[in-house]
Structure formats: structure tokens, C-alpha cells
């Protein structure tokens, strides 16, 4: 790590370093990058106006960090970080947990009814389905269910890489069940996240204690403009200095 061979370091070591230099979780300074601002603007618009939107961007462009910060500061906003192994019940149980609902048991029908009933009581709720491209088709169909039941009351934002757009367009073209409806409900529009810039990375470095210009340039080059990578490289620099 001290010699700059950062690509060879395993995840476990990065976690140890993060703990050791006091930069876990809340100690990492969030910077309003171009991607952060766009993601936040979409979430605000969707929640205030009960809109349904789809946002796509490269991995590491800052979508999830902006979402996490938004949810911490806005009532009735729920962040689902999806996983490939989720089935229908896993999806619904995780949404129940994010909403603070105690009862996460019952049939799929029961869970849907409980969630809809709870959301109908809330003022301007927002469901954020992060990494939606990891969901199987049958789970992604829940998007249609919640849209139909909560239209004009609950905002829904699908977030993913560009693969989601390709998948939905291809699904509609091949007349696969549900994809035409999904495409229609997001307004046939996928909002693109802006590319991370060197200025974004420099601002992140400076906000987190790295102000040496050479170090910032090195981090920028090695990061491939992936903000998760930037965080790791900042940790490594602080450890070696």
C-alpha cells in the first residue's frame, strides 16, 4: 500500500485501513458532484410530484451515495438496494423493513396489501429501487403493481446501469410480458447520470483531507472516474502519509 500498489490490495485490507484511519461511514464527507446534484433533483421531483422515473448511470457514478443521503434527510423515502437472489417475497420483505413495518410475514398478496395500505396513509411517499437491473423479470413486474395501485400518490424511481434500458427496450421489442408497460410507465425516458469529472474527484479529495495536487492527479488517473475507487484511493493515500 505504501509503495502505491493499490490494485493488489484485497477488500478485507481496505476495510481494516478504513477503520484504522477513522473514515468509516459517516466520517466520509459527501460532495455535491454533478451526479449527486442530478440524482437528488430527480428524487425531489419524484417525491414532491408523485412521479415515476428511471435513472441510469455507470457503476460508481454516485447514484447510491446520493440516494442514501437523500433518504436520511427526507421523510417517507425508502431505499431498496436490490440483490440478484431476491425473489418476490424477498423484495416485499425488504420494502416492509425499510418502511419500518413490523409484520414482514404472510403471503405475497398479504405483503402487497399491507405495503399499499401503509403507503396510502403517508404524505408523498417515495420508493427508490436501486440496482433494479439485478431483479428478475417476475420481481421487476412489482413495479407495475405499485404504479397501478399508487399512481399520483407515491413516487417511484428505478436506478440502474444502462443495462436496464437495453433490457426494457429489448423486452418490449420482443413482446415479453410486462416490458411495454414498464417502458410506458417511466415515460419512455431514461435519465442519464452525468460523467464524473476530474473536478468532481478533486473536490472529493479535498473535502476528505487530500490537498496535495500530485496525489489528487494520481487518484484521478487510477480511479477510472469510479467514485467507489476514489474513496479507496483516498483511504490508501491517508494511510501512507
Residue ranges and their predicted role:
Residues 118-139, 143, 147-150:
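Conserved P-loop NTPase "ATPase switch" module shared by AAA+ and STAND
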Residues 54-59, 135, 147-178:
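Sensor-1/coupling segment of RecA-like P-loop NTPase cores
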Residues 18-22, 89-105:
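Conserved NTP-binding/hydrolysis module of P-loop NTPases
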Residues 1-50, 236-241:
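A short, basic N-terminal segment
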Amino acid at each position: 500500500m505504501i509503495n502505491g500498489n493499490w490494485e493488489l490490495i484485497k477488500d478485507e485490507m481496505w476495510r481494516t485501513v478504513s477503520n484504522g484511519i477513522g473514515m468509516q461511514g459517516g466520517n466520509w464527507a459527501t460532495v455535491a458532484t454533478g451526479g449527486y446534484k442530478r440524482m437528488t433533483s430527480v428524487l425531489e421531483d419524484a417525491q414532491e410530484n408523485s412521479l415515476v422515473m428511471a435513472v441510469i448511470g455507470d457503476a460508481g457514478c454516485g447514484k447510491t451515495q446520493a440516494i442514501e443521503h437523500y433518504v436520511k434527510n427526507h421523510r417517507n423515502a425508502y431505499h431498496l438496494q436490490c440483490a440478484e437472489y431476491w425473489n418476490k417475497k424477498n423484495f416485499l420483505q425488504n420494502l416492509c423493513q425499510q418502511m419500518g413495518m413490523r409484520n414482514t410475514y404472510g403471503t405475497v398478496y398479504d405483503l402487497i396489501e399491507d405495503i399499499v395500505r401503509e403507503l396510502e396513509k403517508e404524505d408523498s411517499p417515495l420508493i427508490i429501487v436501486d440496482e433494479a437491473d439485478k431483479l428478475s423479470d417476475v420481481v421487476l413486474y412489482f413495479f407495475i403493481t405499485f404504479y397501478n395501485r399508487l399512481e399520483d400518490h407515491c413516487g417511484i424511481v428505478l436506478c440502474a446501469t444502462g443495462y436496464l434500458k437495453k433490457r426494457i427496450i429489448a423486452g418490449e421489442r420482443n413482446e415479453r410480458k410486462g416490458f411495454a408497460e414498464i417502458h410506458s410507465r417511466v415515460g419512455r425516458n431514461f435519465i442519464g447520470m452525468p460523467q464524473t469529472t476530474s473536478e468532481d474527484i478533486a473536490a472529493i479529495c479535498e473535502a476528505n483531507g487530500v490537498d496535495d495536487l500530485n496525489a489528487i492527479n494520481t487518484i484521478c488517473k487510477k480511479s477510472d472516474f469510479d467514485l467507489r475507487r476514489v474513496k479507496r484511493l483516498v483511504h490508501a493515500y491517508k494511510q501512507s502519509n
